[in-house]
Amino acid sequence: MEYKIIADGACDLYGENADKIGVQIVPFYVAFEENVYKKEGAEIEVRHFYKEMVENPTVFPKTSMPSVQDYVDVFTPIVKAGEGVLCICITTKFSGSYNSAVNARNMLLEDYPDAKIEVIDSTLNTVEEGIFVREAARMKAAGLSLEESAVSYTH
């Protein structure tokens, strides 16, 4: 079965870096003083995010995890196309992103009981999660199935 690799934005892979290895990113939301949350990497460039931090050192950004609906919106077309999903999330110690993805999976399994959706808590964050995601992409390119890839990360 063909499958897609999905990762949350905590892996720090955006744009060409994610596209090059065939990974779709579900972004986190960020806000500064105005409290308008924007999708990191999609609605606010990562470069702009860091520029805001440098130019306003006393203003601390707030973040919010991807919602269940964000994951449903990404998983649904993949499942409808008959493909599997391997979703890699930031450690549950830092975020509820994994729980959002699990809830989205459970919702989709109600309508698509044969869907193959694996959600993995990477137990990592930022660059380390990115390395984890790159390794998953390498394993997929080497021909490992969704199940083989998921098992290698959960055991």
Regions found by a protein language model. Give the residues of each.
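Structural beta-sheet core signal
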Residues: I5-A7, C87, V119
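Short, surface-exposed connector motifs at secondary-structure boundaries
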Residues: P57, A81-L86, A115-K116
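N-terminal glycine-rich phosphate/adenylate-binding segment common to multiple enzyme folds
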Residues: V68-A101
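Conserved small/polar residues in nucleotide/adenosyl-binding loops
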Residues: T154-H155
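N-terminal glycine-rich anion-binding loop in soluble enzyme alpha/beta folds
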Residues: K4-V68
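Active-site histidine-anchored catalytic micro-motif
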Residues: I90, G96-A150
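A short helix-to-beta-strand connector/capping loop
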Residues: M1, I21, P113-K116
